[in-house]
Design a protein with these regions (language model features):
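Short, low-complexity N-terminal intrinsically disordered segments enriched in polar/charged residues
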Residues: 1-32
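A beta-strand edge to alpha-helix "cap/lid" segment located at domain peripheries
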Residues: 58-149
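Residues at structural and domain junctions
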Residues: 11-12, 35, 58, 94
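A solvent-exposed, acidic/Ser-Thr-rich amphipathic alpha-helical stretch
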Residues: 23-87
């Protein structure tokens, strides 16, 4: 597999494991000294970043993160990438929904186990929040639930 494909698959695994809350596999996306900057929310290690996500995106928080239009540059055993993010967070218990977009800026390092994230983060281009009570007819179904029409 070429480096750009491997880095793309790593980013997709990061997003899938974040949204499915598979925290051990999520942690495997990073080197221990990973740093993060999510629009000013800073992290100085993999453990701090993963712990924060685990505590702040518990079961019942529905998330969708998608990235598009990668700009990946590989230089030996390091790489950089920019990704266009679209995301949504729904918290039925609080009747809350957030939609937004951002640009991720990532750095990667090649390890004996393959490419890993050395730094990740994004800068928001916009964010919209909704009170679900203000959206008539809204029904939110989580994993395993379906609306039958």
């Amino acid at each position: 597999m070429d480096d750009i494909t491997a880095i793309s698959q790593l980013k997709y695994r990061y997003l899938r494991t974040l949204d499915t809350k598979q925290w051990d596999e999520f942690a495997e996306c990073f080197v221990p000294e990973t740093t993060g900057d999510y629009n000013g929310l800073l992290f100085e290690s993999r453990d701090a970043l993963v712990s924060y996500m685990k505590e702040n995106l518990p079961e019942g928080f529905l998330t969708m993160h998608q990235v598009h239009h990668p700009e990946i540059a590989v230089d030996g055993d390091t790489a950089t990438a920019r990704w266009y993010l679209q995301d949504k967070v729904i918290v039925p218990a609080f009747q809350f929904m957030l939609e937004g977009a951002a640009f991720y800026s990532d750095r990667y390092v090649r390890t004996p186990d393959g490419w890993r994230v050395a730094h990740t983060g994004y800068q928001r281009t916009f964010e919209v929040t909704y009170d679900l009570k203000d959206l008539p007819g809204t029904k939110v179904n989580g994993p395993g639930e379906h609306t039958h029409v």
